[in-house]
């Protein structure tokens, strides 16, 4: 796997030992799927499904859980999908960009793939809301097992833990993050040991590894068994994280962590819970905590809460990262992004995302009240994202001539059948809570599509009223205005049109700088732009330059740092102290007669008005900035 350099980062990246990387991956990647044993088997036998915890049913459910982990995580993600990377990066946003790169420029297929990617991203944000709520709530519910009278305190304690977690986000996770791996590793060892302890009491539970028991369950329960898949899929929530975090740890480390630690420990724990239920069917009320000896109950509650917090942290951090990528690709408005680490570029904090997530997580916990009710809502976001990932992977592989068509067809049939069955099993629970993540997804999707469409209309209007730059400059030189020392940098989305900021500067100030740079910043469909391709400078007239700066969608755009490289190009010697950046600030006026429906126009105006200023996003010093306003009707 190749690595690409970050902007402004000339230091070599030192590689850690494999064991250290694997331990870190366990802490970040597998927190979500690692806390699934807290609620999966309990949900499968909830009154919603009407299943009796008898011998055949228990073995059937366990077999479905085991083979769901094998098919969805081991085969689909670990073996197949993690082979598809965008210069080492994974995740639905990276896969969308990669798939679009295989298509002819301007084709409708790019638009359709973009729609799929946006909706998958919207569902991921919904997952980021439900995961912290259900993980922490399930962990704290262990208090009900230890002390039944504590039931009334479960929700308040859960809210306190979650609020504290979100309040601490602005300080970053660089220090405490080093403990995530060891704590999560201890969690997996602990649940594996508890599983072995219970398996010894009823070793016949090991028969559940035979897929016949899963097939027997389908034959025994018929169509009703499809409903139960809505609970079984909870065992593979977090599978998407293996792919999304591939760029941070590498495919090899994630595969090793899954095969040698996570999968064995999860399998042992699920089988252990099943063994307990075979011996004591009344334990089905909360088989995870019932399977733990009394002396270890409180330590396990503490460890489970820590693991749930770490799982939540991984989703929160992932939401920040995905938001940053979406901003770079133009899917959402610019937001304030703060870097919480001086040594690690990828550690960021996005306040708007943080407080929005906290508000929605609190409403989710209060609205659902317990993990059983929440489980009905959880699966839709997860299975929807997984199915979209599968479709995008198939579209990408179809464009690759090296992939045998027969093999691709077989993979497509199996993966779509499995994902489709899981998605259907969750969507039929619409009135039981599945409406919630779908509503979240539709709302986020609407915001993203409105922003994309609004930006396109805005650029079209500005281009329509614009003047061709190459035609404008010769006329300007015939009667040049007064020149002042220094460099003026005009940010523009279209390098062929005279920037509005330049027109306003000439109209009101009637001066021109010695050097004038028309700067366009472009985000590529790759994670990191190579330093050799970062900067393109084109002299267009005496004292005028057209400059393109390229960033990858995983990078934080730092315009001044990128311009420092211009000293290597003849004619421009970028001096920050003698440079003024000119930015046009558009005031958008909604119109009922063109573009989008008026309600979407007003939504776009609201988002545009609250977007972070360009200087903050591009890291331009405020004392070197001149902002000139213009009105645009869309």
Swiss-Prot record:
Q: Which GO terms describe its molecular function?
A: potassium ion transmembrane transporter activity; symporter activity
Q: Which Pfam families match?
A: K_trans, K_trans_C
Q: How does it sit in the membrane?
A: Multi-pass membrane protein
**Main location (coarse class):** membrane
Subcellular localization is given as: Cell inner membrane
Looking at the UniProt entry, the stretches that span the membrane are 21-41, 58-78, 110-130, 148-168, 180-200, 217-237, 258-278, 296-316, 348-368, 377-397, 408-428, 432-452
GO CC: one term? Answer: plasma membrane
Record key words, sorted: Cell inner membrane, Cell membrane, Ion transport, Membrane, Potassium, Potassium transport, Symport, Transmembrane, Transmembrane helix, Transport
- InterPro entries linked to this entry: K+_transporter, K_trans_C, K_trans_N, Kup
Superkingdom per UniProt: Bacteria
Q: Which reaction does it catalyse?
A: K(+)(in) + H(+)(in) = K(+)(out) + H(+)(out)
Summarizing the function annotation, the protein's role is: Transport of potassium into the cell. Likely operates as a K(+):H(+) symporter.
What the entry lists under HAMAP family is as follows:
Kup (MF_01522)
Say which family it is in.
Belongs to the HAK/KUP transporter (TC 2.A.72) family.
Annotated protein name in UniProt: Probable potassium transport system protein Kup
């Amino acid at each position: 796997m190749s690595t690409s350099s970050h902007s402004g980062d000339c230091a070599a990246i030192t590689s850690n030992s494999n064991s250290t990387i694997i331990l870190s991956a366990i802490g970040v990647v597998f927190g979500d799927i690692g806390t699934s044993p807290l609620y999966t088997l309990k949900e499968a036998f909830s009154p919603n499904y009407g299943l009796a915890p008898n011998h055949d049913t228990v073995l059937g459910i366990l077999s479905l859980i085991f083979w769901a982990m094998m098919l969805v995580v081991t085969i689909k993600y670990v073996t197949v999908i993690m082979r598809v990377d965008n210069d080492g990066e994974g995740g639905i946003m990276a896969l969308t960009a990669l798939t679009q790169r295989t298509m002819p420029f301007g084709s409708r297929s790019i638009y359709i793939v973009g729609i799929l990617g946006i909706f998958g991203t919207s569902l991921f944000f919904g997952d980021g809301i439900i995961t912290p709520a259900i993980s922490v709530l399930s962990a704290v519910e262990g208090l009900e097992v230890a002390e039944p009278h504590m039931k009334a305190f479960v929700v308040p304690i859960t809210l306190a833990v979650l609020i504290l977690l979100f309040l601490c986000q602005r300080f970053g996770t660089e220090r405490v993050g080093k403990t995530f791996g060891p704590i999560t590793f201890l969690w997996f060892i602990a649940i594996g040991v508890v599983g072995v302890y219970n398996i010894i009491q009823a070793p016949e539970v090991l028969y559940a590894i035979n897929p016949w028991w899963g097939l027997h369950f389908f034959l025994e329960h018929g169509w009703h068994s499809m409903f139960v898949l809505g609970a079984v899929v909870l065992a593979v929530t977090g599978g998407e994280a293996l792919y999304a975090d591939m760029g941070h740890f590498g495919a090899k480390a994630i595969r090793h962590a899954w095969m040698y630690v996570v999968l064995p420990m999860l399998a042992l724990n699920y089988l252990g819970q099943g063994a307990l239920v075979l011996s004591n069917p009344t334990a089905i009320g909360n088989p995870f905590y019932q399977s733990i000896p009394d002396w270890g109950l409180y330590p396990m509650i503490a460890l489970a809460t820590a693991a749930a917090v770490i799982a939540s942290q991984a989703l929160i951090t992932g939401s920040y990262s995905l938001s940053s990528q979406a901003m770079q690709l133009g899917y959402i408005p610019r937001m304030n992004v703060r870097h919480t680490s001086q040594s690690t570029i990828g550690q960021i904090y996005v306040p708007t995302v943080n407080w929005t997530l906290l508000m929605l997580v609190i409403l989710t916990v209060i609205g659902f009240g317990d993990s059983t009710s929440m489980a009905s809502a959880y699966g839709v976001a997860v299975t929807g994202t997984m199915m979209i990932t599968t479709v995008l992977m198939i579209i990408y592989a179809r464009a690759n001539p090296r992939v045998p068509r027969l093999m691709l067809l077989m993979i497509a049939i199996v993966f779509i059948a499995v994902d489709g069955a899981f998605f259907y099993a969750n969507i039929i629970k619409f009135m039981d809570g599945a409406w919630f993540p779908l509503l979240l997804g539709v709302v986020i999707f609407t915001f993203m599509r409105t922003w994309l469409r609004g930006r396109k209309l805005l650029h079209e209007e500005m281009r329509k009223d614009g003047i061709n730059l190459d035609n404008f400059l010769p006329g300007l030189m015939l009667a040049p205005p007064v020149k002042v020392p220094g460099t003026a940098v005009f940010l523009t989305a279209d390098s062929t049109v005279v920037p509005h900021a330049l027109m306003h500067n000439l109209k009101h100030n009637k001066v021109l700088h010695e050097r004038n740079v028309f700067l366009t910043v472009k985000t590529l469909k790759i994670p990191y732009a190579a330093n050799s391709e970062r900067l393109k400078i084109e002299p267009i007239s005496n004292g005028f330059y057209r400059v393109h700066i390229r960033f990858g969608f995983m990078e934080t755009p730092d315009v001044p740092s990128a311009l420092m490289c211009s000293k290597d190009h003849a004619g421009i010697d970028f001096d920050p102290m003698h440079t003024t950046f000119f930015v046009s600030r558009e005031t958008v006026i909604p119109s009922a007669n063109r573009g989008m429906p008026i309600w979407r126009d007003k939504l776009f105006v609201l988002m545009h008005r609250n977007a972070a200023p360009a200087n903050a996003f591009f890291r331009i010093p405020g004392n070197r900035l001149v902002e000139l306003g213009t009105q645009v009707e869309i």
